[in-house]
Amino acid sequence: MSSTELPETRTAASPATRSRAVRVADGEELRSVALPGLTLTVRARPGTTAGLAPALYVHGLGGSSQNWSALMPLVSDLVDGEALDLPGFGDSPPPDDADYSVTGHARAVIRYLDAAGRGPVHLVGNSLGGAVSTRVAAVRPDLVRTLTLISPALPELRAQKSAWPTALLAVPGVAGLFARLTREWTAEQRVRGVLSLCYGDPRQVTDEGFRHAVEEMERRLELPYFWDAMARSSRGIVDAYTLGGQHGLWRQAERVLAPTLLVYGGRDQLVSYRMAHRAAATFRGSRLLTLPEAGHVAMMEYPEQVAAALRELITDAADVTSAEGGS
C-alpha cells in the first residue's frame, strides 16, 4: 500500500474552482491535456537535446508529478521527460466516470500516450504508480521501452502494520470520518506525518523542501474532492490486491516484456522490503536496486542513486535495440 503525500483536495475541472498555483521548478513546464471525460496535468522536463527518447513518470497514492522533480533533471540529457498528475491528484481534476481503480488509472496513462503519440516510453512508476505502470506494460507492451518500479504497490500476503491506515481509507465512511477528526490539523502537522511515513530519514528534507511541501499541502486543503479521490484510489489498490487470474498484478508482472528495474527501500513502511526478491524473480530478466536507508520514495530521497540505475537500464536497453537493428 502507499500514500506518498497526505490530504489534497479540489472539485472538478472548472478553472473557477482552482486554488493557488501549483509550484513549477526551474526548467519544468506545466500544461493541461484535455481528453474525452478526462483532463490531465502534465509536468514536462524537456531533454537537453532534441530527439531524445521519451520518458513518463507516474506518482503514487496521494502524490503528484512534483514527486519527480528531483529525479527528472538528472536524466534530462538521456530522455525527454514528462510526469503525469493522475486523475484527481496533483493539479488534475477528477475523471468524469469517477474511476480510481488501478485499471482506471492505467487506462488514463494509456489514453494519454496514445493521444500524445509519445510511445514507446521509458515508463517509471512509484507505489500506486508502480502498480499502474505494471498493468500498462503488461497490456500495452508497444507503449513501453523500459519499466522502472520504485516501491511498487504489488499484492502482499502480510501487509505491514504501518500500511493499514491507508487500507482503512478504502472502507466506506472512513475517509469522511478521518477528515472530520483531523480538521484541526495544520498543514505543517500533516506534512510531518507524511514525511515520517514515507521517508527513511525525514531529517533529509531541507528547510526549503519542507516549506514547499507545506505550501502544496495548504493548496490541497483548499480543494474539495481530495478525500473522495484518496478513498476511491485506496479502494482501487485493495481491489487490485484481491484480483486473481489473468488480471492479477503478479500474473501481469510475469507478462511484462520490457527490461525492468526494481527499486526497494530498506526503511519502507508501506511496501515491504522483503517483496524485492519476489518481484525480481517475477519480472523476467529484471535488475534490482536496494537502498537500505531509503523509505517509500527513493526517487526523492536518493535521486542520484536512482538516476544512475535508471541511466544504466536505459543505456543497456538502447544498446540491445541497436544491436538488433531496431530504432
Give short role names for the model-derived ranges:
Residues T282-S327:
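Catalytic active-site module of serine/aspartate enzymes centered on a nucleophile-bearing elbow/loop
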Residues V256, L262-Y264:
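Short beta-strand/loop motif that positions the catalytic acidic residue
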Residues M1-A55, S76-D80, R107, R118-G119, ...:
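Alpha/beta-hydrolase fold catalytic core
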Residues T103-V121:
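Conserved acidic catalytic loop of the alpha/beta-hydrolase fold
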Residues A138, T146-E184:
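Flexible "cap/lid" loop of the alpha/beta hydrolase fold
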Residues L243-G244, R267-V271:
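Acidic catalytic loop of the alpha/beta-hydrolase fold
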